[in-house]
Amino acid sequence: MSELRLAVMREDIPSSSPISCGIASIDDRIKDAYSKTICKQGLAYNIYVDGYLIGNCMIKLVVLCDEANDYYVTDHEYAALEISYIAIDRRVQGNGIGTRVLARLISDAEKLSKILPIRFLVLDALDDKVQWYLDAGFTTYPKREDLRYADTVPMRI
């Protein structure tokens, strides 16, 4: 099996080795990933396989509101870790790399939730990726509509 490595971004992705997952809105987010990492608005990782840069992903902390349950002490807010996106270059998609990255992010989130008050790992899935996330153990959940990501399905694990 090839070596998978996630490394925190230390600079913008060079224009000489661009990454495109084939979805313009996600490709645009990759362009801002390093800036968001510097400003502590998220943590972007470059994804390497056998030393080659083949993708990028981002996680961040979010605060969600769960008004449906009544077991909260004072309010209905809780912290969650969000996978903002996973982008694998379209030239290497279909080889299981995204599945390995997702498994790694799930494992890392489970470890963090043991030392930090993180309740869920959440994401907004594109319609054509919902089954992929279901297969990884995610479920859908009700969430207030987020107009920034209107064509997505909220999911959590």
Annotate each predicted stretch with a short phrase.
Residues 1-95, 100-122, 126, 130-157:
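Non-catalytic substrate-recognition and accessory regions of acyl/acetyltransferase enzymes
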